[in-house]
Structures are given as structure tokens and as C-alpha cells.
Design a protein with these regions (language model features):
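FIC/Doc superfamily catalytic core
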Residues: 1-127
Length: 127
């Protein structure tokens, strides 16, 4: 079973990633980003594996600009947290993570399967 973030989780992640004075521009966009990994089509998960769900969350947060400032930081930290609460950890250098999030945010990398493949490549489980 997959565990998901909720709005309170996301706001706390934003405060940690961006700073205590997070300014939300559009709560609806935050809610939409949170709902996307849970989406289903005709009773089937739209994003059938954990890394596709994480990719959908990252993509929505990075592209939709729900915050006044800090959308990319929120997107990455929320994605990493989502994977962590589902017992998957990320191992990638700061430069790799930066380039990856910039590529997603600018649309240079927009295919969810490609985003998920990168996350999967960096992902590991302990034990």
C-alpha cells in the first residue's frame, strides 16, 4: 500500500525547504499536485508504480507554481519525502538533483516515464 502526503505535510515540507514565511499563491494547485499521484482511470491507477507517482508529484509541483517562491525546492523535497515515507531513498549528487529539477521545471524533461526512470535509477531501499 502506498502512503501519500497531505496538505499539512506539504506545507510543513515547504516551510522546511523554503523557510518559515512560505507564501502560497494558489492552494488549489497544491491540492491538485497532491491528488495527481492518487489518480485513477477506469478503476486503474493512472500511475501504477511508486516512481511514476513520485514523478507526477514532482512534475505538478515544479510546473504549476503554487508558491510565490520556492516551487522547485518544494517539488524536490516533497518528491524525496514521498519516496521516503514509502521506504525508498534517493542517492544523487547535489548537481545531479539540481539539473534534474531544473529540467523538469523548465519542461526540458516533461515525460513522466523519463522522470520516473531517473528517480528509479537513484532510488534504493535499505535492508
Amino acid at each position: 500500500m502506498t502512503d501519500y502526503l497531505d496538505l499539512e505535510d506539504l506545507l510543513e515540507i515547504a516551510r522546511e525547504a523554503v523557510g518559515r514565511d512560505v507564501m502560497v499563491r494558489d492552494y488549489g494547485l497544491l491540492e491538485s499536485a497532491l491528488a495527481r499521484p492518487r489518480a485513477s482511470v477506469f478503476g486503474q491507477d493512472a500511475y501504477p508504480d511508486l516512481h511514476l507517482k513520485a514523478a507526477a508529484l514532482l512534475h505538478s509541483l515544479a510546473r504549476n507554481h503554487a508558491l510565490v517562491d520556492g516551487n522547485k525546492r518544494l517539488a524536490w523535497t516533497a518528491c524525496r519525502t514521498f519516496l521516503a515515507i514509502n521506504a525508498h531513498w534517493i542517492s544523487a549528487s547535489e548537481d545531479e538533483r539540481f539539473d534534474f529539477v531544473i529540467a523538469v521545471a523548465t519542461g526540458a524533461m516533461s515525460d513522466l516515464h523519463e522522470i520516473a526512470a531517473q528517480l528509479r535509477g537513484w532510488s534504493y531501499q535499505e535492508g
